């Protein structure tokens, strides 16, 4: 039975993930740094890791198995986990595909170089209720068809 792993530090759709997982009776593991520690986890399965730059990513890589569902905005982590045979969603419900990763990583690299030169672009728009609903619908549809 697959599980859902969530890169939870900045994930805006944790409640939606939990609802979908309960409906499909899937386990969810939220992975976050101790910077986001809370004693109130509402019975959810949370794993807290050191605050090091890649600590949460490393834990997720170790936990992920073929067929698992991952939710992350981290393109680098997504590319590694896709290679392990997982299904990776963005926080906006986009299902990443291996054949897109090279281009996405290249764009990420170019944006990082631009930032080093002081050139900044606008970030993503704030999550709306419609965005949350779209994420939930896409994850639900994926699981229904799996």
Curated annotation (Swiss-Prot):
Q: Which InterPro entries match?
A: UPF0178
Q: Name one Pfam family in it.
A: DUF188
The cross-references to NCBIfam families, in alphabetical order and at most eight, read: PRK00124.1
What HAMAP family does UniProt report for this protein, alphabetically?
UPF0178
Q: Which PANTHER family match?
A: UPF0178 PROTEIN YAII
Q: Which family does it belong to?
A: Belongs to the UPF0178 family.
Q: What protein am I looking at?
A: UPF0178 protein Lm4b_01466
Organism expressing this protein natively: Listeria monocytogenes serotype 4b (strain CLIP80459)
Lineage runs: Bacteria, Bacillati, Bacillota, Bacilli, Bacillales
